[in-house]
Regions:
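Catalytic core of Fe(II)/2-oxoglutarate
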Residues: 56-204, 208-217
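Conserved double-stranded beta-helix
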Residues: 1-57
Length: 220
């Protein structure tokens, strides 16, 4: 059992030449939401599978876009999965377990999780002290597999050989031009990756997300 943020989100998009290794997540997400870089976007697919017998822990997603109605992959959540492109579809992992069990006092980065065969329970320990135990049916296993998808061999070579990569300078210039065309007043950032005025303006210009005020306490 654990809490989960109520907000739906998109996973960070990768582009030819720009990814986690050289570009901050806020910029990748902004570029993805802007729709200005589809010619550079790396297409991906994910398979997510759950093995869980406890309460809540469902998966909410917006297959018709952020303005469309959400759908919920509900129970039974045992050996059940989805094939998705989570860089393009808003989604959220719903909180797991009963609300009164989601906080774990004493949990730390050094805490350990182990199975105790003598009691048929899973135990969380911190510095050797047991702070929480779970029955097997309360445990949830989630497997998330991701792959890049290519139309043909020419597209594979374009990515592998870096013959048509996007650069940070190209990305910033394209964003600035579009923001100004939309009427957004923004100055020329001297350091766009750290210029808070530019960052706020870019995020505000391209922010889009579903509403989640319909979530109740148990599910959210």
């Amino acid at each position: 059992p654990h809490r989960s943020g109520t907000n739906a989100h998109l996973d960070a998009v990768h582009f030819r030449g720009l990814g986690f290794e050289n570009t901050p997540t806020w910029l990748l997400n902004t570029m993805g939401k802007s729709g200005l870089f589809e010619d550079y976007r790396l297409k991906k697919a994910q398979v997510i599978t759950w093995w869980y017998l406890g309460e809540h822990g469902t998966f909410t997603y917006w297959p018709d876009g952020p303005d469309g109605p959400p759908q919920v992959l509900g129970h039974p959540m045992w050996n059940r999965g989805v094939v998705v492109e989570n860089e393009r579809m808003f989604h959220r992992g719903d909180p797991v377990g009963r609300p009164d069990e989601r906080d774990v006092p004493g949990l730390a980065h050094r805490s350990l999780l182990a199975y105790d065969a003598s009691t048929d329970t899973w135990r969380i320990t911190t510095d050797g002290a047991v702070i929480r135990t779970y029955r097997p049916e309360e445990m949830r296993l989630l497997v998330h597999w991701s792959a890049e998808v290519y139309t043909d061999l020419d597209e594979v070579k374009k990515v592998a050989d870096h013959t048509d990569d996007l650069t940070l300078e190209m990305a910033i210039d394209r964003l600035l031009a579009d923001m100004r065309a939309r009427g957004t007043r923004v100055g020329e950032p001297s350091d766009p990756l750290h210029d808070t005025e530019f960052i706020r303006a870019a995020i505000a210009t391209y922010t889009v997300a579903p509403t989640t005020d319909w979530l109740d306490e148990a599910s959210g």
